[in-house]
């Protein structure tokens, strides 16, 4: 376990890395005894720094929802991070590339809550009951921590990703919002185009067999900390495509079939 000073130092390093756009060394190398709980404590400390600086919590994200990603990360459950007010971009907007380090785009569904949601024992049915709208969403992920250590060639571990706010950096909401019982949320097909070329496609069932399962998992995971998911919060349910790298000048268009589409451009 890390001590309180190590936790604060790590959070400050992440904050400086985001501001300077210069990645820091992997925490899993600097702190070989780091645990999953340490990583979440670092994440909470970094989010607290941001909120102290004027940011507002707007919701949460769920990551590592596919079985393949969990196996590759040597874990058996998803991870989560915080969504802050300055992470949201309008659909169709120009997104400044200079704000990020190595941005990538993922395809998701977002749950907009209409009622409080709290574990333990939260189920998919509780999530559907508490959700006011489901809407297409793009998540922009980034890495403030080095993905590969230049000295050892070690790849980052799940401890690094969790500390790094589960890699979250931005959100674009768009397309057609629907009530959670209006469609089968498992069967939303998507096609992602980058500069007019199909790069990824997927279906929403790839998220834990039902995207609402991730939201239930999050409510249960946060229950020991007495955290309630609140009305109006945005919950990103997890990606059902592989991430696609974004470069300056890239235009993204994602077709969600009956739920419309989302477009954005990095400048």
Name every feature range the model reports, one short phrase each.
Residues 2-209, 251, 259-267:
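Catalytic-core "active-site belt" of small-molecule-metabolizing enzymes
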Residues 52, 241, 247-248:
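N-terminal low-complexity, intrinsically disordered patches enriched in charged
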Residues 202-206, 214, 224:
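Conserved phosphate- and dinucleotide-binding cores of soluble alpha/beta proteins
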Residues 215-243:
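A conserved acidic, glycine/proline-rich C-terminal tail/linker
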Residues 225, 230-233, 250-252, 260-262:
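A short pocket-lining beta-strand/turn micro-motif at the edge of beta-sheets
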Residues 240-244, 258-261:
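Short, charged beta-turn/beta-strand-edge "cap" motif at the junction between a beta-strand
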